[in-house]
């Protein structure tokens, strides 16, 4: 036990580095990041104040508190960074230019009809000044407005906003 107490600072440092590496390269769920930062903070605290928290129980308590503090400080900024990688208005950009098949009897520019895209039946209407499309015809997706596809009989090369 005496040998472990002499190297607790280095052990906390190694635990912190391992947790951060696991977060970066293996798990990537933000949990190990907070534990790693808590262990590194605990290592720094043990190095500077060895007599205050000499027992292992106190060090584990401080490790938990440091991890909680790092969680409170970094959770919301990291949550915004991780989950807001794409703009919500551009989230359907992979659909633009794809082909759909008319599923309802007709689809026109002033009434919503249904089209089949990638096996899913979706609501759609035609772009302004388009001739009505009949069942079975092929259309191209030129835009998305909410959960409704905007389609055209002609493929457009640019991603102009037709909404």
From Swiss-Prot:
Keywords: Cell membrane, Membrane, Transmembrane, Transmembrane helix. The chain crosses the membrane at residues 7-27, 51-71. GO terms for cellular component: plasma membrane. It is a multi-pass membrane protein. Gene3D superfamilies: Nucleic acid-binding proteins. It is found in: Cell membrane. This is Uncharacterized protein RP252. It comes from Rickettsia prowazekii (strain Madrid E). The lineage of its organism: Bacteria, Pseudomonadati, Pseudomonadota, Alphaproteobacteria, Rickettsiales.
């Amino acid at each position: 036990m005496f040998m472990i107490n002499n190297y607790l600072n280095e052990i906390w440092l190694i635990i912190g580095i391992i947790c951060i590496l696991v977060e970066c390269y293996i798990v990537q769920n933000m949990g190990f990041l907070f534990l790693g930062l808590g262990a590194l903070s605990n290592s720094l605290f043990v190095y500077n104040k060895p007599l205050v928290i000499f027992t292992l129980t106190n060090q584990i308590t401080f490790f938990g508190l440091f991890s909680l503090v790092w969680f409170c400080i970094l959770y919301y900024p990291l949550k915004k960074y991780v989950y807001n990688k794409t703009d919500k208005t551009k989230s359907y950009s992979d659909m633009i230019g794809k082909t759909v098949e008319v599923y309802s009897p007709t689809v026109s520019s002033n009434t919503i009809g249904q089209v089949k895209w990638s096996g899913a039946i979706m609501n759609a209407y035609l772009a302004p000044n388009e001739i009505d499309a009949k069942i079975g015809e092929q259309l191209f997706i030129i835009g998305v407005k909410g959960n409704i596809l905007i389609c055209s009989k002609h493929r457009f090369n640019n991603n102009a906003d037709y909404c």
